[in-house]
Every structure is written in structure tokens, then in C-alpha cells.
């Protein structure tokens, strides 16, 4: 058994109009509480000593980094999972930004934000 989760990065992209959709969470705490419920509802089927991965990146808002990946990592740790690895997946050009590096660089400089080129893959072991 191996569970892979790739949740929305909070409200960066809206996936639906459903109020239960994680991407429609109004606050960071609401998002994390809801993600915690997803962990509980999913990993209850995962047997002891099996593994789970969470693929997620961070968010940039109000001129600061919101370490969403590490907040989500903590949701697993609070539930007794062991953190076995943190992998950093680097990516250069995504399909949505292909051949548009110049405009994104300009937007980042003029609007005071950072262009992320990575996301995390957290590997956990269920021990309870």
C-alpha cells in the first residue's frame, strides 16, 4: 500500500464551486483543518508500517511566503506519522508558463513576489 496525495495549494487555483473543496477554504486554518480531515479519511485505510506521500508547494501572498508545504507536513506529524523524507522537486518551465519567462519575471519584479520553481514531496510512514 502507498497513498499519494496532491492537494490544492489552498486557494491559488479554484477547482470547483463546491464548499467542501479544499481550494475554496476561506482561511489558512480552515484549509489545514479540512486537509487534516482528508488525511484522516484517507489514511484510515492505510495499514500500519505502510507509506504515504504528500506533494505540495508553498504560496506567496501579501509580499511573503506562506510555507503551505510545511504546514501540511505538520498535519501528518500531529497524527503520529513519521517523516521519512523531504524531496524537493525542481521544475523550470511549466505548461502554463511556457515561453513566458520574461513576462513572469517582469510581473514578479513589479509586483514584489517570488516565482516558485519547486514543490515538496513529503514521505511519511504510518506507525499507529
Q: For each of these PLM feature ranges, what is it?
A:
Residues 1-128:
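Class I S-adenosyl-L-methionine-dependent methyltransferase catalytic core
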Amino acid at each position: 500500500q502507498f497513498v499519494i496525495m496532491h492537494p490544492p495549494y489552498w486557494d491559488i487555483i479554484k477547482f470547483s464551486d463546491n464548499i467542501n473543496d479544499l481550494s475554496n477554504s476561506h482561511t489558512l486554518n480552515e484549509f489545514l483543518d479540512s486537509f487534516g480531515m482528508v488525511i484522516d479519511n484517507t489514511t484510515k485505510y492505510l495499514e500500519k508500517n505502510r507509506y504515504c506521500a504528500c506533494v505540495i508547494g508553498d504560496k506567496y501572498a501579501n509580499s511573503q511566503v506562506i510555507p503551505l508545504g510545511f504546514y501540511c507536513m505538520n498535519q501528518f506529524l500531529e497524527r503520529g506519522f513519521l517523516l521519512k523524507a523531504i524531496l524537493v522537486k525542481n521544475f523550470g518551465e511549466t505548461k502554463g508558463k511556457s515561453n513566458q519567462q520574461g513576462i513572469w519575471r517582469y510581473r514578479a519584479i513589479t509586483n514584489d513576489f517570488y516565482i516558485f520553481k519547486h514543490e515538496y514531496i513529503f514521505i511519511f510512514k504510518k506507525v499507529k
